[in-house]
Regions:
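Long Lys/Arg-rich low-complexity intrinsically disordered regions in nucleic-acid-associated proteins
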Residues: 1-233
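Acidic, Ser/Thr-rich intrinsically disordered and amphipathic helical segments
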Residues: 207, 227, 273, 277, ...
Length: 333
């Protein structure tokens, strides 16, 4: 089935079960006639026994039609809605006393301009979970608290990061936090699998290192790069190795400053519109290398579109010290 989605201030989109399409009115030089019960040529050929003249009644006509073009689902609003009331844990007074908006799957389907499959996939990507029938995002400090419980248990039990037992985690940590939250954090930061009838998790090293980097950077405007790398490596669980490529789309290194610095720049905080996204990036930095800018524009690529094609359209290429760099095609205010 097809459904048109969009609020009064939004450009309507058409959604199937798994795809989203922009809708635009297109003109046609041929008049389109609306005929109830009209048969196609194929249907008429199939009924050759009766060759009668058909007197058709025209119910209406049009000189334009809706043209559909596959587009990216508009999912930024999903995170924005869920971040109105992030889940801070079962003991949070805010959760018990205040009545913030909470959203079911049906609510999100009516508010987000995307297909059902695209919305459900994005909920997985942003690590949302269902609590009492409502979709929630964990407040970051609470998320890190849960992750810390798990990594400390892994360390104290000397478990392999590739084989963390669910049952033991729930038994050991169930007195500290709800078991649903412990399992959710394992699902968010690990891959679930079964071995000899027992459920285990293989922890994602890159994702854990990335979360700890975000925690370290969130309260600093800029961080000395070498100092940050030292503190970051000391902060991750034993056996994990930190690398700057784990921070793509999360943090940006300023190699032009002395000493070199790093600061938080999350791709999800940037505008969803292509031109606005490029304007924001060129306000932050006048010239970008392709390596630096790619994590911040990759999600803008439409079906079969490349990062190179986006850069050709929205940026101007030049060479600086033998390195190809990109700056804005238009003046940035």
């Amino acid at each position: 089935s097809l459904v048109i989605r969009g609020e009064k201030d939004e450009q309507a989109v058409l959604c199937s079960k798994d795809k989203t399409y922009d809708m635009k009115i297109a003109d046609t030089s041929n008049m389109l006639l609306f005929i109830p019960g009209c048969k196609t040529p194929e249907q008429l050929n199939a009924d050759q026994a009766s060759c009668n003249i058909i007197h058709a009644q025209i119910a209406g006509f049009s000189n334009n039609y809706w043209e559909l073009r596959r587009c990216r689902p508009k999912l930024k609003k999903l995170r924005k809605l869920l971040m109105e009331d992030p889940y801070e844990g079962p003991e949070s007074r805010k959760d018990q006393t205040l009545t913030f908006s909470k959203y079911t799957t049906e609510d999100l389907l009516s508010l987000i301009q995307a297909s059902e499959e695209e919305i459900l996939h994005e909920l997985q990507v942003i690590d949302a979970c269902k609590i009492e029938g409502y979709w929630r995002i964990l407040e970051f400090d609470y998320e890190m608290k849960l992750l810390n419980h798990v990594t400390q248990l892994i360390d104290s039990e000397s478990w392999s990061l590739s084989k963390v037992p669910l049952r033991t985690c729930l038994e050991e940590l169930g007195s500290l936090e709800p078991t649903e939250m412990i399992e959710h954090i394992l699902l968010s930061y690990g891959r679930k699998y079964t071995d000899d009838g027992e459920i285990y998790f293989e922890m994602h090293e890159d994702k854990i290192c990335r979360a700890i980097a975000r925690m370290l950077l969130q309260n600093a405007v800029k961080f000395n790069l070498s100092e940050f790398q030292e503190v970051w490596q000391q902060s991750v669980p034993e056996g994990m190795t930190t690398r700057l490529d784990q921070l793509k789309g999360l943090a940006l290194v300023d190699k032009s400053s002395r000493p070199e610095t790093i600061f938080l720049l999350k791709v999800e905080d940037l505008p969803e519109d292509n031109q606005e996204r490029f304007n924001s990036l060129f306000r932050i930095r006048e010239k970008w290398t392709e390596v630096d800018i790619t994590p911040y524009i990759q999600d803008l690529c439409a079906e079969k579109q490349t990062v190179g094609a986006l850069l050709t359209k929205y940026a101007r290429c030049s060479t600086q010290n033998g390195v190809k760099v990109y700056n804005s095609r238009r003046p940035i205010s």
